[in-house]
């Protein structure tokens, strides 16, 4: 089933609401919500995506930003060891998560800490698009 893209309806929205809506409509639905993630508003122009990547080493993760698309991939290196689980609650499968970013959103960096991959984003509005004060003479 195809999901419609309602992002043109949100053109008048700015900031987190618009980013959140674009992230929701732009993500791939085939991965079943794996891995789970959060989108946090740090301040007016700063955002942070936290993705739960338990079991992945730093070299097994790949982050790519191209145009307004952020792609996060996780692929386990080498062969998987066959284990006899009594209960398996931690998924060990590879993943690809796509995020559609709003205009003027740039990826500033990423770090892996305690099984969470943090990706920092910043909205940088060009000077030409910022409001300017007109002096009355």
UniProtKB/Swiss-Prot annotation:
It is found in: Cytoplasm. Belongs to the small heat shock protein (HSP20) family. It comes from the Bacteria. It comes from Pectobacterium atrosepticum (strain SCRI 1043 / ATCC BAA-672) (Erwinia carotovora subsp. atroseptica). Associates with aggregated proteins, together with IbpB, to stabilize and protect them from irreversible denaturation and extensive proteolysis during heat shock and oxidative stress. Aggregated proteins bound to the IbpAB complex are more efficiently refolded and reactivated by the ATP-dependent chaperone systems ClpB and DnaK/DnaJ/GrpE. Its activity is ATP-independent. GO terms for biological process: protein stabilization. HAMAP family: HSP20_IbpA. Residues 28-137 form the sHSP domain. GO terms for cellular component: cytoplasm. PROSITE patterns: SHSP (PS01031). SUPFAM superfamilies: HSP20-like chaperones (SSF49764). Keywords: Chaperone, Cytoplasm, Stress response. Monomer. Forms homomultimers of about 100-150 subunits at optimal growth temperatures. Conformation changes to monomers at high temperatures or high ionic concentrations. The gene is ibpA. The keyword DNA repair does not apply. InterPro entries: A-crystallin/Hsp20_dom, ACD_IbpA/B, HSP20-like_chaperone, HSP20_IbpA. This is Small heat shock protein IbpA.
